[in-house]
């Protein structure tokens, strides 16, 4: 049965755990244990906000460790959960970090990036609220350039109507806009730490904002281009930057979700001959401890507490085991969820059931060329069969195998679709076999192609 969007009865605490699972079912097949775990974690956040007194601060999230091979839905569950709640979401691979003092990024950059995401989210939301006013002010500025500030109200009204109707889109005007030319560098890379940068405060910008002024530049441009530049400018003036930053920090602290992938790669396996690597991995784990347990990280927007951020760690754990992580880190990830490897039935459901399934995506893409693309049930079964076979024989990459198989299967159709307007193409099991059987039977070739 296909998952469909449901309208729920209003709950003062947001979605219930069962409703959260139903929402995740719209996009993700199976993995009920993992869905249940994240649904409970999310609901507990809402419950905590309703607890009164000092006890509220003592209630911390129960962080989650997801165990499962690649392509089974670990990242997608976390990402969809964040979208469902409009929470700031940040995904990072644990292998990108090294302990402080070594080459690599320091773990505190997680919080800096999460807050940046929260600020952008809040800023976008604030701009939508002032969009109408910003548009009005932008039109007034363009009218000043078109007909002059001293023109009569009748003239301005007449030209305003033309702007709104798009009649003056290609008219060139000369107008003053904010000078966005960078002076010097806004940030610099920290030596010995690739990918890590430190923001530099621009005193000129700060003083300009404080005095209500900023550098402008007169440019010649079309009316439609001027609108695209001036509306964001006017939006910036209308929104309260300080309030946005406060709201963003609060959003990151109380609703932020951090997904740390490949955590098994920093586990100490105890293998001989890799002592230095073991020390480095253990160092990263020790650096992660205070972040997950709860600490304060300084960002360019101000200090951010990590006490109530939900951390979801994941890994395949093919070589290392969860018990190879530092005992202290294991204690910070109390909820363990094992995700199942995908079966043939799962693959069939993944192809058909989600609202954004691959079959629907490819049909929509080819449909833009006025070509009707349909898949017979026998073809879906054959594709799932081949996906499982290659995963078993080559390497198990889960549902991601379907992407490579479908790309190879539909390569010729995608290439020729623009010359097949008005046609209907039905993919059946014979078509799938003709296109893929040679590759599937030749495992050496399958390793490179699929």
Swiss-Prot record:
Single GO term (MF): ATP binding
GO biological process, one term: proteolysis involved in protein catabolic process
InterPro entries for this protein: AAA+_ATPase (IPR003593), ATP-dep_Clp_protease_ClpX (IPR050052), ATPase_AAA_core (IPR003959), Clp_ATPase_C (IPR019489), HslU (IPR004491), MCM_dom (IPR001208), P-loop_NTPase (IPR027417)
Gene3D superfamilies associated with the record: 1.10.8.60, P-loop containing nucleotide triphosphate hydrolases (3.40.50.300)
Major localization class: cytoplasm
Localization per Swiss-Prot or TrEMBL: Cytoplasm
Alphabetically ordered keywords of this record: ATP-binding, Chaperone, Cytoplasm, Nucleotide-binding, Stress response
One family name in Pfam for this protein: AAA_2
SMART domains xrefs: AAA, ClpB_D2-small
CC per GO annotation: HslUV protease complex
Chain sites annotated for binding ATP: 29, 71-76, 261, 328, 400
PANTHER family, per the entry: ATP-DEPENDENT CLP PROTEASE ATP-BINDING SUBUNIT CLPX-LIKE, MITOCHONDRIAL-RELATED (PTHR48102), ATP-DEPENDENT PROTEASE ATPASE SUBUNIT HSLU (PTHR48102:SF3)
Function: ATPase subunit of a proteasome-like degradation complex; this subunit has chaperone activity. The binding of ATP and its subsequent hydrolysis by HslU are essential for unfolding of protein substrates subsequently hydrolyzed by HslV. HslU recognizes the N-terminal part of its protein substrates and unfolds these before they are guided to HslV for hydrolysis.
Subunit (UniProt): A double ring-shaped homohexamer of HslV is capped on each side by a ring-shaped HslU homohexamer. The assembly of the HslU/HslV complex is dependent on binding of ATP.
Family: Belongs to the ClpX chaperone family. HslU subfamily.
Name this polypeptide is given: ATP-dependent protease ATPase subunit HslU
């Amino acid at each position: 049965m296909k998952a469909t969007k449901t309208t729920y009865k209003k709950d003062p605490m947001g979605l219930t755990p069962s409703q959260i699972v139903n929402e995740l079912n719209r996009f993700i097949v199976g993995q009920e244990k993992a869905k249940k775990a994240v649904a409970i974690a999310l609901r507990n956040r809402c419950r905590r906000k309703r607890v009164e007194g000092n006890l509220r601060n003592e209630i911390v999230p129960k962080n989650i460790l997801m165990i499962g091979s690649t392509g089974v839905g670990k990242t997608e569950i976390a990402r969809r959960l964040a979208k469902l709640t409009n929470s700031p979401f940040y995904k990072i691979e644990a292998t990108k970090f090294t302990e402080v003092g070594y080459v690599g990024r320091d773990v505190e950059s997680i919080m800096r990036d999460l807050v940046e995401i929260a600020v952008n989210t809040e800023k976008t939301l604030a701009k939508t609220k002032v969009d109408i006013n910003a548009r009005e002010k932008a039109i007034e500025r363009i009218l000043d350039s078109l007909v002059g500030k001293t023109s009569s109200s009748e003239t301005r009204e007449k030209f305003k109507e033309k702007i709104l109707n798009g009649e003056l889109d290609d008219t060139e005007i000369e107008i003053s806009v904010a000078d966005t030319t960078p002076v010097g560098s806004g940030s610099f890379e920290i030596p010995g730490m690739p990918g890590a940068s430190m923001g530099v405060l621009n005193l000129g910008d700060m003083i300009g904002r404080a005095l209500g002024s900023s550098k402008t530049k007169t440019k010649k441009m079309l009316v439609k281009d001027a609108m695209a530049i001036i509306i964001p400018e006017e939006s910036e003036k209308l929104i309260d930057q300080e309030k946005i930053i406060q709201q963003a920090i609060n959003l990151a602290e109380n609703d932020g979700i951090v997904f740390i992938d490949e955590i098994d790669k920093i586990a100490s396996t105890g293998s001989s001959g890799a002592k230095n690597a073991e020390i480095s991995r253990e160092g990263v784990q020790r650096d992660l401890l205070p972040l997950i347990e709860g600490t304060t990280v300084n960002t360019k927007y101000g200090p951010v507490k990590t006490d109530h951020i939900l951390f979801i760690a994941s890994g395949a754990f093919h070589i290392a085991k969860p018990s190879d992580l530092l005992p202290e880190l294991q204690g910070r990830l109390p909820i363990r969820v094992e995700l199942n490897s995908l079966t043939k039935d799962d693959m069939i459901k993944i192809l058909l059931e989600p609202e954004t399934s691959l079959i629907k995506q490819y049909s929509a893409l080819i449909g833009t060329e006025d070509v009707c693309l349909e898949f017979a049930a026998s073809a879906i079964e054959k594709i799932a069969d081949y996906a499982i076979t290659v995963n078993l024989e080559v390497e198990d990459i889960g549902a991601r195998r379907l992407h490579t198989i479908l790309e190879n299967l539909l390569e010729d159709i995608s290439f020729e679709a623009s010359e097949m307007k008005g046609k209907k193409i039905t993919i059946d099991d014979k078509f799938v076999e003709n296109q893929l059987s040679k590759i599937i039977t030749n495992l050496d070739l399958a390793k490179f192609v699929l």
